[in-house]
């Protein structure tokens, strides 16, 4: 299974003055596999330490931060020497050993030859709680579920994935129906590695759904096991409400849907816990679609999405036939799935997302982002509906923007906006860069 992040890891490896690297990501998005795959492919040796299960290694760090003694102790435990320049050191579930966190500072300052990558399932929570975290001494990379492009490669469609990335619209046109079929399949499978692997090997939708439900159970167990006891009920309320929140015409998150009289301040900790775990994405409203978007952020209004479109489908129990054949059940929920998909693709591609709505609610844009000096208003259409009323409002009132509608239709450039195929939406910034006048 090819992951795009492997290329970024290789860049990190070859960077002069690199720092220890921390990979962030939700449980079961493939962090451990990625680190081991990177180590076995690009290093002559790797050392894997899981602080959740390796009590000896944990004790070595807890006894003091003399790095030479720690390395010596690890070598004794492993029964082999650790060659700093040719070995990848992997610290997994590092949140279980705060002293290992702290040691990263000293590795960066004193033992610069060592290649160190760390990760953990609840790393975001630990980062908020750990006051001795080595600020400025580490680098971060975020790992998300497989993108649609990675999914295509995993199911044996590498050439098709490459064609999509080329943005050769003429050559892509004959493969539109095939791409739409794979896209709808991705709506069901999602990007969780175990689900993708099972589908790639067996094409068994039922077994994929079993895996997704198992992942959901693991997340719910994490709520009880790792979150503060008093916050757990509120975490569950937010988590369970997300499909219904996304099914609304106006997808702004409404706390009143959780329970009567619910207030935002009562749920702040629960919301942040879910974000820190990488389980949700919180997208703020902007009051104006103008540069810089951050300056117009309205923190009181936001939308909440899940980490994965397949997990969203599993939560509402959408069956594969509904999605692939487009029956009434899918028709009712397709807008939510499509928005969830677009959000994943754009965030995985490195974009910071917002949404926009007019003060009186007369118009709303699903997403808005900026690329260099360009503001991109984005209206999402689940099928081939070419109406884009809200996009038209923005285009007329903010002429310096680059309006885009994304849908199942083919690429087309119109006088006031661009229709961009859903299957290629992760390459939207690339396309705009190509269109930008060269100085």
Say what each PLM segment does:
Residues 1-16:
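Pre-Walker A adenine-sensing motif
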Residues 23:
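Hydrophobic anchor at the beta1->P-loop junction of P-loop NTPases
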Residues 31:
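Conserved lysine of the Walker
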Residues 34, 38:
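Hydrophobic positions on the alpha1 helix immediately C-terminal to the Walker A/P-loop
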Residues 53-84:
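Short glycine-rich substrate-engagement loop in P-loop NTPases that contacts/grips substrate
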Residues 90, 115-121, 142:
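Structural recognition of the conserved hydrophobic beta-strand(s) that form the central parallel beta-sheet
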Residues 127-247:
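Interdomain motor-coupling "hinge/lid" segment immediately C-terminal to the ATP-binding subdomain
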Residues 197-364, 368-370:
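Accessory nucleic acid-recognition modules appended to NTPase machines
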């Amino acid at each position: 299974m090819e992951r795009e992040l492997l290329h970024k890891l290789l860049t990190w490896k070859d960077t002069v003055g690199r720092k220890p690297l921390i990979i962030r990501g939700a449980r079961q998005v493939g962090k451990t596999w990625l680190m081991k795959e990177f180590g076995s492919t690009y290093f002559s040796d790797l050392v894997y330490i899981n602080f959740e299960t390796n009590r000896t290694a944990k004790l070595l760090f807890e006894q003091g931060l003399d790095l030479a003694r720690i390395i010596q102790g690890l070598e004794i435990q492993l029964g082999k020497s650790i060659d700093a320049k040719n070995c990848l050191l992997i610290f997994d579930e590092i949140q279980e050993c705060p002293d290992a966190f702290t040691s990263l500072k000293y590795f960066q300052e004193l033992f610069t030859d060592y290649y160190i990558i760390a990760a953990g399932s609840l790393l975001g929570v630990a980062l908020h709680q750990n006051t001795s975290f080595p600020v400025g001494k580490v680098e971060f990379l975020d790992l998300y579920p497989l993108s649609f492009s990675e999914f295509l490669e995993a199911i044996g469609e590498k050439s098709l994935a490459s064609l999509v990335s080329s943005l050769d619209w003429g050559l892509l046109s004959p493969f539109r129906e095939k791409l739409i079929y794979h896209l709808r399949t991705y709506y069901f499978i999602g990007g969780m590695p175990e689900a993708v692997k099972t589908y790639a090997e067996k094409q068994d939708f039922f077994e994929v759904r079993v895996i997704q439900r198992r992942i959901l159970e693991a997340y719910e167990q994490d709520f009880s096991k790792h979150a503060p006891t008093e916050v757990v009920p509120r975490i569950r309320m937010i988590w369970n409400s997300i499909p219904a929140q996304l099914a609304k015409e106006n997808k702004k998150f409404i706390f009143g849907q959780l329970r009567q009289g619910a207030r935002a301040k009562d749920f702040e900790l629960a919301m942040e816990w879910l974000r820190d775990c990488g389980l949700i994405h919180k997208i703020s409203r902007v009051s104006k679609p103008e540069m810089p978007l951050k300056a117009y952020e309205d923190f009181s209004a936001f939308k909440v999405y899940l980490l994965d479109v397949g997990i969203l489908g599993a939560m509402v129990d959408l069956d594969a036939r509904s999605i692939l054949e487009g029956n009434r059940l899918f028709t009712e929920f397709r807008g939510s799935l499509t928005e969830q998909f677009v959000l994943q693709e754009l965030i995985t591609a490195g974009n910071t997302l917002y949404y926009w709505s007019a003060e009186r609610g007369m118009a709303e844009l699903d997403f808005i982002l900026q690329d260099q000096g360009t503001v991109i208003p984005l209206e999402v259409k689940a099928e081939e509906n070419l109406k884009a009323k809200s996009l038209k409002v923005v285009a007329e009132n903010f002429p310096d923007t680059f309006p885009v509608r994304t849908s199942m239709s083919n690429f087309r450039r119109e006088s006031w906006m661009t229709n961009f195929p859903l299957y290629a939406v992760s390459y939207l910034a690339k396309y705009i860069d190509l269109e930008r006048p060269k100085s």
